[in-house]
């Protein structure tokens, strides 16, 4: 009876903790759980012990493919055995991961709609990956790494046996970073690309420039970054950009640049005559104009030449040209500008600044159409809401205070046969105390929480409309985000969007079912050396994150 009393007391305490936090014990997580959840997964009943000296990867006839060689190096030397434990050797038979890819090794980055489908079978003797493309093989290898866990009782690495068939639900699954409000170093961007690949995300939307700064280095127009960058150190050279694109390619990620026009352009002031003069209500000229001058015909020649350079720098077939929040600056920069008003009268626009916007956008559409390296434009949704959109455009949705309002936006735009990308569900720069990936957080717009539950096709529309939903991009705007906090603020909150955009909707209805796998994902990424914040109330990881020793930045 004496032994029974402490056991009962412990049970009561455990129950109280569970009730207090509304969760099970903080050490509840999956073992060898795959994130995002595969389309079909069947686990075996036994696990296999693996050691780093007895495991190998056979790339078959693709042994010279740089993408697969990089993959093999990363997983063999880092990601398969991430935990800080003494590595055992010997004692097991060789375990070979055989990778078979049908298509040839591509020389460039992935293209929109490229297959990421794969088959993965792990037995007690081997692992076999089959994929149409190298991109599918990358996704399969990441899933395989999720099957590996450290058994604390036996002090061994083990891998779960499994059969997986998997492919993404949407072709566009991304992260948007903002390097204008706060400059993000190339190394920090690369770290986010690595974590993106570990969540099977495939698009980096790079919001390069905005009103605050112009860190993009233009060879043809050096006055842009010369005047618009925060300092000569806060710029991305052509080599930096090529480095990011190459790094992303090896991880199956496309890089889509954004150059927002005609608003958010104060940092373009190095180009004389590019911006309109803006005035306050007393008619006094303001210090920082923020709209392109549509009267100056030379500005369109400049935009054409500048975008030609951009397309030579960024190989992706899409080009994001912004178009948002023009109305924020219209009164100050167009309506109060006497020259603009006279120009509008001459063009027959009267006082309708929407017609002036359309005039600008129609010229921009023609510029894009005539680019030597063809690109499909992406615009923020105001270009659809307020203007005459380019019939070839993709519309990027960022508005809506509730999931229902967002769904209505998607329904409206797809009804006009425009493809859409949704970001409104996942504005991760908004933070509030609580587990916002799953719960509705008071004090924020409802759309700025419950990230796991926002489904871009959850509207009453036709099959054709829902096929026009290309996916989503989780956005982290940079007003209060820089190198020091972007990683923890993004992850694992962006992982909720990653599963929503990859996994079957019918299998991912409850965050309650997902959180043990997300907890294992968080701890896995922490062990890999990333700053992944807690996401499920008080808990712990077997191996906690530890900051490396500080070093003095070279001046």
Swiss-Prot record:
It catalyses: Hydrolysis of terminal non-reducing N-acetyl-D-hexosamine residues in N-acetyl-beta-D-hexosaminides. Its EC number is 3.2.1.52. GO terms for molecular function: beta-N-acetylhexosaminidase activity; hexosaminidase activity. The gene is hex-1. Optimum pH is 5.5. It is an enzyme of class 3 (hydrolase). Responsible for the degradation of GM2 gangliosides, and a variety of other molecules containing terminal N-acetyl hexosamines. Degrades chitotriose. The keyword Signal applies. Disruption phenotype: Worms show reduced degradation of p-nitrophenyl-beta-N-acetylglucosaminide and no chitotriosidase activity. The keyword DNA repair does not apply. Keywords: Glycoprotein, Glycosidase, Hydrolase, Lysosome, Signal. Its main location: other. InterPro entries: Beta_hexosaminidase_sua/sub, Glyco_hydro_20_cat, Glycoside_hydrolase_SF, Hex-like_dom2, HEX_eukaryotic_N. Belongs to the glycosyl hydrolase 20 family. Glycans are attached at residues 47, 351, 412, 460. This is Beta-hexosaminidase A. Expressed in coelomocytes and neurons of the pharyngeal region and nerve cord. The active site is at residue 325. Residues 1-18 form the signal peptide. One of its GO terms (cellular component) is lysosome. One of its GO terms (biological process) is glycosaminoglycan metabolic process.
């Amino acid at each position: 009876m004496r032994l029974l009393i402490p056991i009962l007391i412990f049970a009561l305490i455990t129950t109280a903790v569970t009730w207090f936090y509304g969760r099970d014990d903080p050490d509840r997580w999956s073992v060898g759980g795959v994130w995002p959840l595969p389309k079909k997964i069947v686990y075996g009943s036994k696990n296999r012990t693996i050691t780093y000296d007895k495991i190998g990867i056979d790339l078959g006839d693709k042994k010279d493919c740089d993408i697969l060689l990089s993959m093999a190096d990363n997983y063999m030397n880092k990601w398969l055995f991430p935990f800080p434990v003494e590595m055992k050797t010997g004692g097991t038979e060789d375990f070979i991961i055989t990778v078979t890819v049908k298509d040839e090794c591509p020389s460039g980055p992935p293209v929109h709609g490229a297959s990421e489908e794969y088959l993965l079978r792990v037995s007690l003797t081997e692992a076999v990956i089959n994929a149409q493309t190298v991109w599918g093989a990358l996704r399969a290898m990441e899933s395989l790494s999720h099957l590996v866990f450290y058994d604390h009782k036996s002090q061994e690495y083990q891998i779960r046996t499994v059969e997986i068939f998997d492919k993404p639900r949407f072709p566009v699954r991304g992260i948007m970073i903002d390097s204008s409000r706060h400059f993000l170093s190339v190394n920090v961007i690369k770290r986010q690309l690595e974590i993106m690949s570990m969540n099977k995300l495939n698009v980096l939307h790079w919001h390069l420039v905005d009103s605050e700064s112009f860190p993009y280095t233009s060879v043809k127009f050096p006055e842009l970054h010369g005047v618009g960058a925060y300092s000569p150190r806060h710029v991305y050279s052509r080599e930096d950009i090529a480095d990011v694109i190459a790094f992303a390619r090896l991880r199956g990620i496309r890089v889509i640049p954004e150059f927002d026009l005609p608003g958010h352009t104060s940092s373009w002031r190095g180009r004389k005559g590019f911006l309109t003069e803006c005035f306050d209500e007393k008619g006094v000229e303001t210090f920082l104009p923020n709209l392109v001058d549509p009267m100056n015909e030379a500005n369109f020649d400049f935009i054409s030449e500048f975008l030609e350079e951009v397309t030579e720098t960024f190989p992706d077939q899409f080009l994001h040209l912004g178009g948002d929040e023009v109305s924020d600056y219209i009164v100050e920069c167009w309506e109060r500008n006497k020259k603009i008003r006279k120009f509008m009268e001459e063009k027959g626009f009267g006082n309708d600044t929407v017609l002036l916007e359309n005039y600008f956008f129609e010229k921009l559409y023609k510029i894009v159409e005539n680019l030597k390296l063809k690109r499909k434009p992406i615009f923020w949704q105001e270009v659809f809401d307020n203007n005459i959109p380019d019939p070839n455009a993709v519309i990027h949705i960022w508005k809506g205070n509730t999931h229902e309002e967002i769904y209505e936006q998607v329904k409206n735009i797809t009804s006009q046969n425009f493809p859409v990308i949704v970001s409104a569900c996942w504005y991760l720069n908004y933070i509030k105390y609580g587990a916002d990936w799953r719960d509705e957080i008071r004090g924020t717009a409802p759309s700025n929480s419950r990230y796991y539950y926002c489904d871009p096709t959850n509207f009453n529309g036709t099959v054709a409309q829902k096929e026009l939903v290309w996916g989503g991009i989780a956005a982290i705007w940079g007003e209060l985000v820089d190198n020091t906090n972007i990683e923890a603020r993004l992850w694992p909150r962006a992982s909720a969007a990653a599963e929503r955009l990859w996994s079957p909707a019918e299998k991912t209805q409850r965050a309650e079912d997902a959180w043990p796998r997300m907890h294992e994902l968080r701890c896995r990424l922490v062990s890999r050396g990333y700053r992944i914040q807690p996401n499920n109330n008080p808990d712990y990881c077997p191996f906690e994150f530890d900051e490396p020793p500080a070093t003095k930045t070279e001046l």
